[in-house]
């Protein structure tokens, strides 16, 4: 019955549009934007090198940390992390980094994957701790909203330039065009 209703609606629209002359588009189309993120990292293998481990194995990175680091790769920022941060992880206990004691980021090596992705793995670990990653061998997770506080706190981004916008806050048509205004 639902299929019948959908067919009826589609037929009605087809008849309606056939009876009207075609009009030129009133809005200019948006220019195509090439992908901004040029890297393709994942959560396992050499990328998890600095993640915590125990007798059950080594935790994977977590998609929030990967996404955050990939976004940071576009600006190749910061030159170095700063501050310190720690939290209690459910699985691996207290996780802490004194970012001030960490070396500067080598963005050329990060973007090229040189050094066996060691620089990438360190960046991913930094991001994971900064967003309170709940590390696990089979899956690591956290709230993506934590990115908005981690970027200014440990990575030198201005508070005014970081904004958390949940995808579900916008209808599909509107969310498609969010990036054009940035």
Language model: regions and residue ranges:
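Active-site-adjacent structural elements in enzyme catalytic domains
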Residues: 1-159
């Amino acid at each position: 019955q639902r299929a019948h209703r959908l067919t009826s609606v589609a037929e009605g629209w087809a008849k309606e549009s056939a009876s009207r002359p075609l009009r030129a588009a009133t809005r200019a189309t948006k220019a195509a934007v090439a992908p901004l993120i040029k890297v393709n990292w994942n959560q396992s293998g050499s990328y998890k090198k600095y993640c915590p481990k125990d007798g059950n194995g080594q935790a994977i990175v977590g998609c929030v940390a990967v996404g955050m680091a990939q976004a940071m790769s576009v600006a190749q920022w910061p030159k170095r992390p700063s501050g310190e941060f720690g939290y209690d992880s459910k699985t691996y206990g207290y996780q802490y980094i004194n970012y001030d004691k960490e070396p500067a980021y080598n963005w050329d090596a990060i973007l090229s994957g040189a050094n066996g992705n060691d620089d990438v793995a360190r960046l991913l670990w930094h991001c994971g701790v900064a967003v309170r990653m709940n590390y696990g061998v089979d899956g690591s997770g956290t709230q993506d909203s934590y990115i908005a506080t981690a970027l200014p706190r440990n990575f030198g981004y201005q508070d005014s330039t970081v904004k958390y916008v949940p995808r579900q806050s916008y209808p599909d048509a509107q969310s498609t065009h969010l990036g054009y205004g940035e």
